[in-house]
């Protein structure tokens, strides 16, 4: 198993010295990074990348044998269809296995059901490009209950088997759920931690 670095939390170090950063994480044993991509707004000052940043980073990543298997994506919750072509191209060009989304801002049953339908559609489109879709939890979707489950569990189940889980154990713990218990209970859905 390889461990990767979520680039959001180390964006300052990356910006200051990309090559020095990659050398340091390579020496520490990391072989993957997971950037956060935005599409509609340039939020690079807040730790996000745009697709062009990924392209520019690839030669340096290759030099240090660092791969990108998963990418967090921040899309318009209701109109992400515009990004299908971009996501497909990224999956094929860079061999990205997983695109990672989060729960919607509003965690009501109706909104979660609507989101699940959109995520199923997105997962089907990504599957055509050889990639999959994962949902990353945050504290709020663990704290809020829907039909007796965490909002995160409810959304995962509503999405069906084509959508997997990327578990943030820290947020899960902060939300009051034992991460180990969750991982064992949902081992078939968890693709990344």
What positions do the PLM features span?
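A local structural micro-motif
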Residues: 33-34, 69, 99, 134, ...
């Amino acid at each position: 198993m390889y461990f990767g670095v979520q680039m959001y939390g180390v964006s300052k170090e990356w910006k200051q010295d990309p090559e020095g950063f990659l050398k340091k994480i390579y020496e520490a044993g990391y072989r993957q990074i997971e950037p956060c991509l935005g599409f509609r707004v340039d939020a690079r000052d807040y730790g996000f990348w745009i697709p062009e940043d990924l392209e520019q980073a690839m030669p340096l990543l290759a030099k240090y044998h660092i791969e990108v298997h998963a990418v967090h994506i921040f899309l318009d919750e209701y109109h992400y269809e515009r990004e299908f072509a971009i996501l497909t191209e990224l999956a094929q060009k860079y061999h990205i296995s997983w695109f990672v989304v989060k729960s919607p801002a509003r965690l009501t049953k109706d909104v979660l059901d609507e989101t699940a339908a959109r995520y199923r559609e997105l997962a089907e489109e990504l599957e055509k490009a050889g990639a999959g879709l994962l949902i990353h939890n945050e504290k709020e979707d663990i704290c809020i209950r829907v039909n007796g489950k965490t909002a995160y569990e409810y959304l995962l189940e509503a999405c069906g088997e084509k959508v997997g889980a990327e578990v943030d154990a820290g947020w899960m713990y902060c939300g009051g759920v034992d991460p180990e218990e969750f991982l064992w209970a949902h081992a078939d859905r968890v693709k990344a931690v």
